[in-house]
Amino acid sequence: MEVVTLFELYELEERLRARGFCHDTREGAPICRWLVERVTVDVMPTEATVLGMASEWFHEAVTTAARMDLGDGLKAPVIKRPHFLATKLTAYRDRGAKDPYMSKDLEDIVTLFDGCQETGFLLEDGSSSLKNFITSGMQVHLENPEFVEAVEGCFRSDPVSRERSRIVLERMRAIATARS
């Protein structure tokens, strides 16, 4: 479901509450996060005027989302990985780049790269403009020594974690130099 207006967001929130969802009120939780049992759902409007957050990729992410079967006849739209990365790169650019060491968006980007064996999937299923945005964004960020240092800072200082950090940066560089 695409939410464009504040009224539509309120309607969706009422529907979520009726199904047992509640806002995640834990410290550090984003304002868009909802919980039910062990399921976590982030509900993001596609228009910036609704929650004051925007990404030029939200609309495309919603319209190209895959449907995931959650069982019991319940299906949920899940945005594709390239769109998730693009929305996180946008969020990092708009709010996290000012202080990369404290950026939750950078942590999410690092987690995405840390959790993949191959980087190609981060560019699959995306338009050329999306792929160009991702590759150029990664190029710009990797040129910033504070970004690289903050990525390294997302890991512990033991040898295994240092190696993970090196692998993540290597994967980021592979995306930055990929051609669509």
Language model: regions and residue ranges:
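Compositionally biased terminal segments of proteins
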Residues: 1-180
